[in-house]
């Protein structure tokens, strides 16, 4: 979702609350819970899951390994659920031509640097840069080149934009900010 007027352009960034992250977190949680239950049933010698008898899986070494995979999967799943609940990576890009200021805001992990806020003048923007990496896993990323600060990404690195979409986004940004476009 974007909001745009004659002098101000605000672009909202999704962050980690994407459908794919919800899907992976659910699959990982259920799979690791299954591994942990199988490991526990082999330790107890009882059928906690009626799919197969617990005598088929000996606790040492199969049950221990299944329990370890289950615990590791629960840790990774909890990490994913935390990033989803904290909405890490979400925020906005605000371009204000009237004030001559660009503000980039992102939510990070809890702590001292939870709020990531970058602010600089439009006159310090050298160009809008498109970085294209072709191959099996092609990647197209849009950067804003800032004098003295380097390049700041405007699109997510995992966002799979088509060449037409990335060109349109770069053209819109460059036109609004009145800066040139570079392609690498």
Curated annotation (Swiss-Prot):
Main location class: plastid
Compartments reported by the entry: Plastid, Chloroplast thylakoid membrane
GO cellular component: chloroplast thylakoid membrane; photosystem I
Example GO biological process: photosynthesis
Membrane topology (UniProt): Multi-pass membrane protein
Sorted UniProt keywords: Chloroplast, Membrane, Photosynthesis, Plastid, Thylakoid, Transmembrane, Transmembrane helix
UniProt-listed InterPro entries: PSI_Ycf4_assembly (IPR003359)
Transmembrane segments: 22-42, 57-77
Family: Belongs to the Ycf4 family.
Function comment: Seems to be required for the assembly of the photosystem I complex.
Name of the protein this chain belongs to: Photosystem I assembly protein Ycf4
Gene: ycf4
């Amino acid at each position: 979702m974007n909001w745009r007027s004659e002098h101000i352009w605000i672009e909202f960034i999704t962050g980690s609350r994407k459908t794919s992250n919800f899907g992976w977190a659910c699959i990982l949680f259920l799979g690791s819970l299954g591994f942990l239950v199988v490991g526990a049933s082999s330790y107890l010698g009882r059928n906690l899951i009626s799919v197969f008898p617990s005598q088929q899986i000996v606790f040492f070494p199969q049950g221990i390994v299944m329990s370890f995979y289950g615990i590791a999967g629960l840790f990774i799943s909890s990490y994913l659920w935390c990033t989803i609940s904290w909405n890490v990576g979400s925020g906005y890009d605000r371009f204000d031509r009237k004030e001559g200021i660009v503000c980039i805001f992102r939510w990070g992990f809890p702590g001292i640097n939870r709020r990531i806020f970058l602010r600089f003048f439009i006159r310090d923007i050298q160009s809008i840069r498109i970085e294209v990496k072709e191959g099996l896993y092609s990647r197209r990323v849009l950067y804003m080149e800032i004098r003295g600060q380097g390049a700041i990404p405007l699109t997510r690195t995992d966002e799979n934009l088509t060449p037409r979409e990335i060109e349109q986004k770069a053209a819109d940004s460059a036109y609004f900010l009145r800066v040139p476009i570079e392609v690498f």
